[in-house]
Amino acid sequence: MLHEIILLLAGNTSGLFIEKNGQILLHPSVQPLHPGERELINDIVSLASKRKRIERYIEIFDEDLIQQNQFLLKALRLLLSKKLFLYDESLANLERMIISSDPYFVGSGKFVSLAQLEAHLADWKETLSSLLVLQGNISQCLSVASTFQKLHNMYMGSTHLNFKKLVLECECAFQKTWLDELVQYLVNDSGDDSFKCSFLCGDTKDFVSCSNNVPFLTQDIVNCLVSIRTCMLNAKKCFTDAFCEILRCFYRLVYEMPLPLTKSSVTKLADEMFTLVSEKIIFQLASFHQIFDLVKMLEMVMLLENVEFLPTLSEMFRDVRGEYCSSNDVQGVVIDDILPVVLRKTISLLDLATEYGECVSFLKLVSIFDEEDEMIRSENRKIDVEGLNMQLLLCLKWPFNLFMDKNALNVYSDLWILLGSLHLSITKIKSLFYERKEYTAKGISQPWTQLWVTLWFLSSLQYYAYECVIKPSYCKLRESLTELYRTQKLRMQDCSQLHALTLTYAKKMLFFYDDDLHISLNSIYHELSLFRSQEVSKVDCQLAAHVSHSIECIRQKENDPSYDREIINALIVQLNL
């Protein structure tokens, strides 16, 4: 009987047993020797039912599964196969001990009882039951994120130590498989977005901004991995030697990863990978000096610290438009044609190519009404140059686009509008005062008090923007980048992070998020657009009220801990004069 039971437990068939409703039971014709023995035998051979269910799942596993966590389900099949192999080995050892009357198992008696057999198989009974629970739960998951989350929930929700160990073993096996797949993801273009979003984040196509991440991933890690992949796919085409060297390093790093994975360990892995990519690929194409030039251009052109840029741009637009209007009748065609010419001539006249190198090729001048350009932002923020609402954009090419994301590009375009509107309004008031002298000389005298107040306010705001915020923060950024370069610890992720911190600080201190203040400033700009030097006295002027409201908006920042108190207080003191 014992031999028949062991054969049955190992997956063989036996005439002494029947299968009923998925359960294997002792045949009714077989009469047990003692009362209760049938129930005990049926309890022992229940392992055969469990083994059969697991084996069936392994055998019918669909290699063509379209589930996004397919590679994890394959890992589950391997884990189940491994456990069944160990189970079969233990049965073979058990039968050997019975046949040889091994005293370790048989003891002092001559025969092995069913109770001894049951006790010996108790651990496997628990293990096979746990494997079925594991298989049932995981096979229902459709994504990588949900699979790892399910494992986490099962681990945290169980009070049984052995089950926790099994779940942890499964999790480590899955994570090892995930790491292997990660390397393949980083170096191969599968062209399957659904795989990428599930692989990194969950059940959404917008995988870069997904909040349902794999438990050991953060959004920063996801962004870093996507950047690494972009670099590797580009290197695959033009840097074969570097690509192969980095790939070998990737496999070494993955092999050395401690399990189970944590956010900290995966962050370190992504950082080391990006460091390799930076050294071997990125800075071979985008040198430190070019990044340094880009930073200078961001400050001087995009943030308009170069006071000659906007006036020159306006002058060029006026001249080029005059040339084109003589040969073109359609205004839309004229604008499309002349803006690239205007920018090119402005760059040439100011010799910006000498100053910033090839970085000037990243600049693009567009009309605010260009609906095809996805980077156009809010219509509430406009800069009027010679009657046309223009916007200067940054169109960075790889690998320069690793220095800042699309959101940062949009911020620079908005800051160009914000600072440009400020600059043009100050120029407008100054021109009014300049022309006023001629009218005053002819005996025409008009009240200009509100314009003086407005000029004082806008000039104070401009001085604060450049002397207190932009110049110091970008000077510090360049010094930090230079220090990294000198210590030979330059990595693109560090450059990008330093720039992001600088831009975040500048945005905050330039009141980028204060819509109330911007509405008030836009009201000032709108009123100024109504003025003509000879008509100032006829305008129903509300400038003083708008200036007063703007100052009040700034005063409210005095005790706000999120602002740099020293410089914000200096501005408030100046505005209180």
Swiss-Prot record:
GO BP annotations, alphabetical order: astral microtubule organization; cytoplasmic microtubule organization; meiotic cell cycle; microtubule nucleation; microtubule nucleation by interphase microtubule organizing center; mitotic cell cycle; spindle assembly
Domain of life the protein comes from: Eukaryota
Protein's cellular compartments: Cytoplasm, Cytoskeleton, Microtubule organizing center, Spindle pole body
GO CC annotation terms, alphabetical: cytosol; equatorial microtubule organizing center; gamma-tubulin complex; gamma-tubulin ring complex; microtubule; mitotic spindle pole body; nucleus
Keywords in alphabetical order: Cell cycle, Cytoplasm, Cytoskeleton, Microtubule
GO molecular function: gamma-tubulin binding
Short name of one Pfam family: GCP_C_terminal
Family designation: Belongs to the TUBGCP family.
Protein name listed in UniProt: Gamma-tubulin complex component gfh1
